[in-house]
């Protein structure tokens, strides 16, 4: 039975999972790597840490499964999106640490671009807004702030890529510089209607075309790994950004289906089919996947802080020692207290898009303690999801019929407390699948589809299995009171923004 290996390169760790041809998991491995915070609002990774942990986990997973390179039909790659690496075109040496998607150092630059009235043009082409979140302004920062970088780029000596592209380059020994349409669509440089890099956007941000990778289908032959990495060459046949990969892993192939992934951040995608839908509620229009040269689009809401709120409880406050303690602790909170955490640690994402505000707690009393803080942290994820859910229902014309169930995945979905509270606040069922490694599964599926190991999308969708459906159990009065309190807290935080 052949294996398909998924590389899942995330914000805080790298993972590798071997899937059998029946979509069951044979083995997995994971390694965390350091985060670097050189200034307020700045987040960086060492590219060598990304590479080293990726290769180490691939080898570890293969060892656990007793698999050789010959046993693996294909590799699929999924990755933290928007994070930028720029490297020397010959040596492969990065010119700077990777600038992570959470990084806000280009906020002032983005504000200037908006003030010049450029956002409508950018949004019309990319489906995105002008925000530090996306890759384009990060690349511009590197070219302008690393000594000699712009001159080298203009001479064709530098390459740019999101993390998938960087890993593909390294895996193929520098032979392949390519990405897929989902990752390209997150750069601010890619026209999602034409399916190509856009010269007007490249000129706007000062990015030479020679730096850019080829854009391919999400399921395609991207290249082959060099033999010395895994004891033999393995073909690489699938790439998708992490949230799009999770959409595929959740089998959201039908327009109107919606999934929400809970990792470091929270990201909800609504499949809108072959037509890109323009949001009137500050959601993003993005490429869900591209198969056979045909793009499928999605509306996306991006939240910057979800699981990282729990990390803050553990690492910042010392309230818990392990993430699994959060739900039971929250269950002990004083119901008479209404404590709200607005976790804008790096600004606010959809649907507010404010890079300047920072997190705040509201409703603290003398009796507020660890249980109330845990409660507020978990509920903040649910409230933020509600904001995305409401925006999607407003933007999607068939909302009443289509977006009635939310498929969830990611580490936080292991918390029954959080998932039940999510169903309560959405007033809608929340479905948790049997296979919760949906991001890796999506990458594996794309690779296995190209390699002929996995079936066509509809047959794959028929194999999706439900683990548990969380049904709303909160009274309408309680739900409305809690949502109103959240809205007041958000307004209170936004009122602290004095602009640039």
Swiss-Prot record:
Pfam families, alphabetized: FGGY_C (PF02782), FGGY_N (PF00370)
GO terms, biological process: glycerol catabolic process; glycerol metabolic process; glycerol-3-phosphate metabolic process
Lineage: superkingdom: Bacteria
Matching PROSITE patterns: FGGY_KINASES_1, FGGY_KINASES_2
Residues annotated as binding ATP: 11-13, 264, 307, 311, 411
EC number: 2.7.1.30
Keyword Transferase set for record: yes
Any one Gene Ontology cellular component term annotated for this protein: cytosol
Annotated SUPFAM superfamilies: Actin-like ATPase domain
NCBIfam families in the record: glycerol_kin (TIGR01311), PRK00047.1 (NF000756)
Name by which UniProt lists this protein: Glycerol kinase
Organism of provenance: Rhodopseudomonas palustris (strain TIE-1)
